[in-house]
From Swiss-Prot:
Organism the protein comes from: Schizosaccharomyces pombe (strain 972 / ATCC 24843) (Fission yeast)
GO annotation terms (biological process): DNA repair; DNA strand elongation involved in mitotic DNA replication; DNA-templated DNA replication; mitotic DNA replication checkpoint signaling; mitotic DNA replication leading strand elongation; UV-damage excision repair
Effect of mutating residue 133 to H: Not functional
Entry protein name: Replication factor C subunit 2
InterPro entries for the chain: AAA+_ATPase (IPR003593), ATPase_AAA_core (IPR003959), DNA_pol3_clamp-load_cplx_C (IPR008921), DNA_Rep/Repair_Clamp_Loader (IPR050238), P-loop_NTPase (IPR027417), Rep_factorC_C (IPR013748), RFC_lid (IPR047854)
SUPFAM superfamilies referenced in this protein's UniProt entry, alphabetically: P-loop containing nucleoside triphosphate hydrolases (SSF52540), post-AAA+ oligomerization domain-like (SSF48019)
Name of the gene encoding the protein in the UniProt record: rfc2
Amino acid sequence: MSFFAPRNKKTEQEAKKSIPWVELYRPKTLDQVSSQESTVQVLKKTLLSNNLPHMLFYGSPGTGKTSTILALSRELFGPQLMKSRVLELNASDERGISIIREKVKSFAKTTVTNKVDGYPCPPFKIIILDEADSMTQDAQAALRRTMESYARITRFCLICNYMTRIIDPLSSRCSKYRFKPLDNENMVKRLEFIAADQAVSMEPGVVNALVECSGGDMRKAITFLQSAANLHQGTPITISSVEELAGAVPYNIIRSLLDTAYTKNVSNIETLSRDVAAEGYSTGIILSQLHDVLLKEETLSSPVKYKIFMKLSEVDKRLNDGADETLQLLDLLSSISVVC
């Protein structure tokens, strides 16, 4: 076939396969947003009144912050006006003072007139600043002035993981909405729906492993599911595949680390620490998983757990400062053997 010959358009099914599942199953309406009932209820009332304030969405990653404001914008303006009425800047965009003064300001000051039947189309635009907590304080200060100057025709939605990193003059001008981590039940239902829709077969316990490895981050869980489905291509997804894709340490290794520490045999502790490090497992991830297992360890008293968790935090701090991972794991296990 000639290079310049006309190509057949992708079928709807082929186009669907090429879209990342995170985007394919992103909520399109506020009703589809899961586990954020109070926030959705308040936003629905603003739809009826057309009186939308500046907003600050904060909470853990993958809880639906960006999806919620996009769904709200879609219900306000409809798909036709989304491009002209909504400006989204995320972490991949430069958001220094120059961008705030030029791109954001030029979009904010343009007036709006056109409407679409069937949608409220209030007389303002929406500017979405994703991961606003990564903006410099100077850029945030410049944004404050822009928010004040164009409040009549523009609404801002700041999205962040940590509200404390937003300067007070900016956060005080916004209505704040906390997005809580998704509960396991809703995550399981959504993942099972996606797996059924994509005709993906899974071994028992895989969905729970996805929830566990993602730590309440729905976006991460869906990405792991798609990666595992691509890896297996028709064969059932296994728990070990999910753990490997997520970079998680298998439970039997975590259990072995604790059991060896309980024996108080220094030689065995040193050997196992070196073996685990040689396997390439991240000590930071091991700390996180040890913490979760120790929380449920019924054989340990609260004072003992307290001492271990204090040591965990100390080792975590050293790792962040660049300390050797093998030595830190050895130090942690030795400390556990002493206090138990």
